[in-house]
Swiss-Prot record:
Keywords: NAD, Oxidoreductase, Plasmid
UniProt-listed PANTHER family: BILIVERDIN REDUCTASE A (PTHR43377:SF1)
Organism, as annotated: Sinorhizobium fredii (strain NBRC 101917 / NGR234)
Protein name (record): Uncharacterized protein y4oX
GO molecular function: nucleotide binding; oxidoreductase activity
Binding-site residues for NAD(+), renumbered to this chain: 4-22
Entry function: Could be a NAD-dependent oxidoreductase.
Amino acid sequence: MTYKVLHIGAGGFGERWCDTFLPQNVADGTIEVVGLVDIDAKALDIGRKHLGLKAEQCFTAAAQAFQMVDADFCTIVIPPALHEGIVDLALARGMHILSEKPIADTMEASVRIAEKVRKSGLNMGVTMSHRFDQDKSTLRALVGADAIGRVNTVSCRFAGDFRLYDSWGRFRHEMMHPMLIEGAVHHLDIMADLAGAPCTSIYARTWKPEWADYKGDTDAIVLMDFANGAHGVYEGSSAQATGLNDWAFEYVRVEGESGTAILDHREIEVFHRYPMRLRQASRQGKGQQVSLLPGRKWQNALLIEQFCQWLDSGPPMATNVWENLQSVALVFSAIESVRLGQPVKVQEFLQSYRVGASIE
């Protein structure tokens, strides 16, 4: 079945959806884009051309689009603070929802959205694109196949040069916690996935160097404990001097009982322990190289396909809104840890919001 889609957000990263992710799924008949919304007329026109839409299929007001467009689901690619209003419009029209991360800009709103969707009986997925990129998927398959034994630690480094104003999208430069909400939301999610268990405790420190043109903190160090005994260390910066590990070129290392797997700049290598040796030493670049998994679609293009398979009565996608609350909880419990200056118990933090969720 080909599903009809109303897409919300053509500017910024929304343009990537319009010129790459959506067209890949239009080309193979997975979806048909039947409407487009953006408050910026210029971005709207660029998106319209990418998608081959008619002028009457494009709108600057979301409410009007939801009234006039007949679609099976909507895709949301706008700032997190605006997500809930679009979710409400979609649910009122009986549309399923596929949204960019995070679910919302607060823990309370994220849980509220998940509850609204659950009560509606409709489906909502969240596009954790980096977990489903080709390199991270290969690393996940490697670790999941027990190539390095039981996981002990997961380390991740993101270092991007977005220090100048508007280099990372204007709204991020105006946020209080841009690194955690817009950056670490992906990386902590990947780390929990590789650890193979929910995060139980998180301790975070954030700051902003004087050369970073942001209102909020651009740098973060995060320590994580997982339910299976694994541990995690995260280092993130959007104000690094040279873009050493920019988007899609992160450094990730998984230490296991019998080996080490390293992902660096989209290249993966594995080091194995030789049990007959008393001790051994290794060096990055000298390990066993691992080829990336083959595939036609990755990142959000793949997640759109998975969402449609879910609508076709397949199993819920891994990043369905209810499961994705775990990823959101990582971010907002980290923010709470920054506020308190001490570790936060993640599952208790999440449960406190679930209990207190208020749906009118």
